[in-house]
Amino acid sequence: MLVKDCMTRHPIMISPETPAVKAQTLMIENKVRHLPVVGDGKRILGLITRDTLMVPPSDLGSLNVWEISRLLSDIKAEDVMVKENALITIDPDATLESAAELMIKEKVGCLPVIEEEVVVGIITEVDMLAKLSELLGGGVEGVRATIRVPNKVGEYAKIFSAVSEKGWGIYASGGAAAPKQPDYWDLVIKVRSASKEELLKVLEGIEGQEVIDIRTIP
């Protein structure tokens, strides 16, 4: 799965001259937290976030309400945006996991997606979570099970074979290293057409594996 499969295409974009107040209004009205700032031909110049629009109280000093209003109306996107040279971006053909690793490493909540110096999309932590939910079958009825398996070749196959022999289908799955147990992995599966009791009986019959959690998702 690649960034281009999960990113938000055609994000709302603003110019450097856009008043910061208008940028904030756009964010509120469209329920977004990031706005790419672009120049001619959608070339990336910077990024506005909710945090960059925060004015420290110390900057307001002893100004009265009218002076504060005038000060805020004079602030432009280019005055508060994350500049291009400090911006972390990604290619649309990058893998989803590389995007996640980059966001974690750089501690950022989004990555503008750039192709040939043009903004073609934006991928955010919300996009990542939405895709994770989809990969694990979020919002779909079924039985969800977490199985701890030895980190050996063929362990996943045992589960898929045992389930398929019953005529059931695994329509979502995902795995990760077990916490503090480097020799084991936790595999999450979601199965339709089986009851929790039926699936549990099959999984408990697989030697060397342990069912950590099993529940029916209505």
Regions found by a protein language model. Name each.
Residues 184-193:
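Short basic, glycine-rich beta-strand/loop surfaces that mediate nucleic-acid
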Residues 177-185, 215-218:
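Short proline/glycine- and acidic-rich turn/helix-capping motifs at secondary-structure junctions
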Residues 27, 35-51, 103, 111-126, ...:
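A glycine-centered beta-loop-beta connector
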Residues 33, 109, 169:
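Short acidic/polar active-site loop segments enriched in Thr and Asp
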Residues 171-174, 204-218:
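Conserved short beta-strand edge segments in small beta-sheet-based binding/regulatory domains
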Residues 1-50, 58-59:
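Basic, Lys/Arg-rich alpha-helical nucleic-acid-recognition elements, primarily the DNA-binding modules
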Residues 1-10, 50-87, 91, 96-104, ...:
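Tandem CBS (Bateman) regulatory domains
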Residues 37, 82, 113, 175, ...:
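Hydrophobic/anchoring residues in structured secondary elements
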